[in-house]
């Protein structure tokens, strides 16, 4: 007897974009386990499954100030456009910057300018407008920082925010320009890690396993599997590791190569996107 329902199939389809029958078969093969079903779909070649599965269902905005980046969520984009909601986000990121706060719990306990805690200010506005509001995440970097905010639509507040902490050998505009280019790169290509060494070992191993099983499913010869797997893992690194990515400004060079030319070292970065995990 199947350990899933028609509603589960529909949910997996909405999550991954794969076909209805493919989703049904993947759930059957994974005994109803959603994470395993996503892997099954990846192995069998469903396009963009991994990327689509990261999506969440939230509205809201991101805001940055003085080394702090905050994501504040609402239930609808109507509220995200509300002036009071945007003012609240500005007050919250101000509290994060002033207190050098990079953790949600600490920021909820911090105070905004009128003396209320961030948690109380959020609760008060939620009660007033009748929607659930949530402080989703916060980052704070204390070094030299470049911030970039991107709007999905002209009538909506920024939905993508990037912070890049960096060191520049020259300390002039060249370094700032390079950091800005990197922030744009992160916003567009969604790097998850700074270096290959930052990718967790279990994540790499899982990518190797999926690459091998995919190659086998495609009928590739056994002797060719190691080379194919290494090639696909290298491709994975180019997708998710910032320094390995081809630069959007010059795709013949990696981000690392362009940063080296500019004498810039990125020490860490954060990328928030409303509606994504």
Swiss-Prot record:
PROSITE patterns (alphabetical): EF_TS_1, EF_TS_2
GO terms of molecular function: translation elongation factor activity
Key word tRNA processing present: no
Keywords: Cytoplasm, Elongation factor, Protein biosynthesis
Domain of life: Bacteria
CDD domains hit by this protein: UBA_EF-Ts
Pfam families in the record: EF_TS
GO cellular component, one term: cytoplasm
Cellular localization per UniProt: Cytoplasm
Region (Involved in Mg(2+) ion dislocation from EF-Tu) residue spans: 76-79
InterPro entries recorded: EF-Ts_dimer_sf (IPR036402), Transl_elong_EFTs/EF1B (IPR001816), Transl_elong_EFTs/EF1B_dimer (IPR014039), Transl_elong_Ts_CS (IPR018101), UBA-like_sf (IPR009060)
Family: Belongs to the EF-Ts family.
Reported function: Associates with the EF-Tu.GDP complex and induces the exchange of GDP to GTP. It remains bound to the aminoacyl-tRNA.EF-Tu.GTP complex up to the GTP hydrolysis stage on the ribosome.
Name of protein: Elongation factor Ts
Organism this protein belongs to: Mycobacteroides abscessus (strain ATCC 19977 / DSM 44196 / CCUG 20993 / CIP 104536 / JCM 13569 / NCTC 13031 / TMC 1543 / L948) (Mycobacterium abscessus)
